[in-house]
A protein has these predicted regions:
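Glycine- and acidic-residue-biased ligand/ion/polar-headgroup-sensing regions
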Residues: 6, 17-36
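Double-stranded beta-helix
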Residues: 44, 61-101
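Short, surface-exposed beta-strand-loop junctions and turns on beta-sheet-rich folds
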Residues: 18, 37-39, 77-79
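A short glycine-rich, His/Asp/Glu-containing loop-to-beta-strand
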Residues: 1-12, 18
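Short acidic-glycine-tyrosine-enriched beta hairpin
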Residues: 35-57
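Short beta-strand His + acidic residue motifs that chelate non-heme Fe in jelly-roll/DSBH
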Residues: 11-13, 31-33, 54, 60-65, ...
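Short glycine/proline-enriched turns and hinge-like loops at secondary-structure junctions
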Residues: 14-16, 23-24, 64-67
């Protein structure tokens, strides 16, 4: 389970090996993905009951629109070396903003 605070998002990223399926079990998200055929960012609101299938190579990102928004993820095995960040998410930006310079 992936549980989000409102207005937090993970980085826009993709995997070359991992195949993912998400089920939205609570709340709402803004689902962002890059259409690799047109090189444009697409967005859609997803909510309880929606399912998303992410094939390898598909850049994706979620922004929680509600507190406690939850994703149930089923996927092939995850390898840290198989995550390729395209755009930073909340945690990367928070860490950057807290640097001492």
């Amino acid at each position: 389970l992936l549980v989000f605070k409102k207005d937090k998002e993970f980085s826009m990223h993709f995997h070359l090996l991992k195949d993912e399926a998400w089920y939205i079990s609570k709340g709402q998200f803004l689902y962002k993905f890059i259409d690799t055929k047109t090189a444009t960012i697409k967005e859609m609101i997803v909510s309880v009951g929606d399912c998303i299938h992410l094939i390898p190579g598909q850049p994706h990102q979620m922004l929680a629109l509600t507190e406690g928004a939850t994703i149930f993820e089923v996927s092939t095995q995850h390898f840290d070396s198989d995550s390729y960040r395209v755009i930073p998410g909340s945690s990367q930006l928070d860490n950057f903003n807290n640097l001492p310079f």
